[in-house]
Each structure stands twice: as structure tokens, then as C-alpha cells.
Amino acid sequence: MRNPDFSPLYRSAIGFDRLFNLLETGQTQSNGGYPPYNVELVDENQYRIAIAVAGFAEQELDITAHDNLLIVKGAHAGEQVARNYLYQGIAERNFERKFQLAEHIQVKGANLENGLLYIDLERIVPEAMKPRRIEIK
């Protein structure tokens, strides 16, 4: 089933609401919500995506930003060891998560800490698009 893209309806929205809506409509639905993630508003122009990547080493993760698309991939290196689980609650499968970013959103960096991959984003509005004060003479 195809999901419609309602992002043109949100053109008048700015900031987190618009980013959140674009992230929701732009993500791939085939991965079943794996891995789970959060989108946090740090301040007016700063955002942070936290993705739960338990079991992945730093070299097994790949982050790519191209145009307004952020792609996060996780692929386990080498062969998987066959284990006899009594209960398996931690998924060990590879993943690809796509995020559609709003205009003027740039990826500033990423770090892996305690099984969470943090990706920092910043909205940088060009000077030409910022409001300017007109002096009355």
C-alpha cells in the first residue's frame, strides 16, 4: 500500500512540526518500525535524532546525507554466529532507515553512545531569507 505525501500541505509550517511531518512521511514503511527512533527539539534551530542500534559497532553503521534525504544503514560485518536462544528480544537484523529533511536542515554530526546513535541536525536559514528591519525615514 502506498502512503501519500502530504508535505506540500505543510509549506507554511516552519521548525520542528514541519521536520517531524516530513520525517514521518518520508520514512520507509517496509522495516516495520525497526530500529526505533526519537526526534528531539534541542532548541529553536537544533534537532537531534536518536536511533536505538544495540548490537551494532560504529564501523557497521553508515550515515549518508544527500540533497534533503538522510539515510542510516546498519549491516553486521561477517557471519552471524548460530545461537540457541531461550528468548530473543534484541533484534540482530540489518536495517536501512530514511529520513526526508526539511529545507535548510543540515546534518552537523553523529555519535554512538550506549547503544544509541545520535544525529545532530541544524536549521540554517540563509541571510536572504531572514526577515530584515526596514528603517522609516
Swiss-Prot record:
Job description of the protein: Associates with aggregated proteins, together with IbpB, to stabilize and protect them from irreversible denaturation and extensive proteolysis during heat shock and oxidative stress. Aggregated proteins bound to the IbpAB complex are more efficiently refolded and reactivated by the ATP-dependent chaperone systems ClpB and DnaK/DnaJ/GrpE. Its activity is ATP-independent.
HAMAP family: HSP20_IbpA
Quaternary structure, from the entry: Monomer. Forms homomultimers of about 100-150 subunits at optimal growth temperatures. Conformation changes to monomers at high temperatures or high ionic concentrations.
Keyword Transport annotated: no
PROSITE patterns: SHSP
Limits of the sHSP domain: 28-137
Pfam families in the record: HSP20
UniProt keyword annotations, A-Z: Chaperone, Cytoplasm, Stress response
Entry-linked Gene3D superfamilies: 2.60.40.790
Compartments (UniProt record): Cytoplasm
Main location per the UniProt record: cytoplasm
GO BP of this protein: protein stabilization
Assigned protein family: Belongs to the small heat shock protein (HSP20) family.
InterPro entries xrefs: A-crystallin/Hsp20_dom (IPR002068), ACD_IbpA/B (IPR037913), HSP20-like_chaperone (IPR008978), HSP20_IbpA (IPR023728)
Designated gene of the protein: ibpA
Stored NCBIfam families: PRK10743.1
Domain of life: Bacteria
GO cellular component, one term: cytoplasm
The protein's name: Small heat shock protein IbpA
